[in-house]
Amino acid sequence: MKNKLIIISAIALAALPCAGQTYLNPDAPLEDRVSDALSRMTTHEKVALLHAQSKFTSAGVPRLGIRQLNMDDGPHGVREELEWNTWNAARWTNDSIVAFPSLTCLAATWNRDLSSLYGKAISEEFAFRGKDMILGPGCNIARTPLNGRAFEYMGEDPFLAGEMIVPYISAAQANGVACCLKHFALNDQETDRFSVNVNVSERALNEIYLAPFRRAVEKAHVWSIMGSYNLWKGVHCCHNDELLNKILKRDWHWDGALVSDWGGTTNTMEAALGGLDIEMGTYTDGKVKESQFGYNLYYLADPFERLINDGTISMDVLNDKAARVLRTIFRTTMNPKKVIGSQCSEAHYDACLQIGEEGIVMLKNSRRTLPLRTERYKRVLVVGDNATRSLTKGGGSSELKSLRDITPLEALRKLFGSDKVDYAQGYEAGQAIYDKVDEVDPALQERLKAEAISKAKDADLVIFIGGLNKNHRQDCENGDRESYDLPYGQNELIAHLAKEQ
């Protein structure tokens, strides 16, 4: 009996320290957890929360058992795993995922329930991969169709964007995965995106460009927001005092963490006092080679800590930033209600199909050609490079490594029967390259066009599948379209094909 009493006493004593650690108690009020954690942290530990420790993670506090934040792109699915310190693919064999429809497609459904379904499904994929934060969705306004990243946003209407963004965020965060709403704010072009200074009237600012963000803050209570590269009133938006401290945090009463876009931080004092909470992806201006990964040289790292220690910047500033990051950690990676999630489930594929079908926009059907009656056609010709191209490849941060891709040509051959469907490429689009255009031989373009026109003469039905293809200066990050025309001579090709039908 004596031995049993000793064992019971030992168990009870072991539990005593945890009982006094409010920050580790998931049932305690969030602000109590945050305050308790802050009271136990050193200045250096607080600063460490505020900047990257790898390409897509920010630090926790290992001494206290506070976990790091794992972030990842992107708006339409979980990006393939990258190496810890580089942009190189880690070449995992188990990181293939479901590629969800574009957010423009989601917005075109005008269906809040589908937006909720989207947020639920995509957050389950992120959770299964061990991610705490979706770097998305995006709700910048499509001021011009030339915007290279328009497909990542929800169109040109602020009301529609606001209505559709809320269910996505609410459903994702109900699963314990933070949304990092982007890009705040006024980021509606890729050209000169690091240096353009946006001029906008107060009315347009509030009624158009900020409106969907405000709705996400006030209705969905989004947990994190990503700053944008551009400037407003001459100050970079990732640390713009008026935009972040006065509008977002004071006027809208937002308590989340403001994350910089990768490389969007430019100044320690502005980052400290201008509302930035987590600095990601900064290049260290030659202080070290990028290959050495000088995370301690980030603007909100050692330079910021020195300003705290010498009294130049108040400890209150540091505590506010650290508190915002801790809230995000406790809401996500240290939230026992965060789902385990799933990857490439049939439910997720069904969600993609439902959203994709409802997001289709028919522009014209004057001859009632659609829906196609397969029994009417014996010789079907499919034309277009996009009939065989996977549009999950390329596009910058939205690029995906999808497990299951069905090309339009494959689907049409299944619908009509392989023996009835012929294919002509029609034009060559080249490789999807992030920062340059893959030049195509004009002679090759002429040969491909001639082949398609020749085959069209014998076809009962020609189906053209074209458009943009994730190439630079099309629908791709870091560049905008140069015209409204379809690239690679597609307009001319379509006109020739129409004459043959």
How would you label these PLM feature ranges?
Residues 19-501:
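Glycoside hydrolase catalytic-domain context in secreted enzymes
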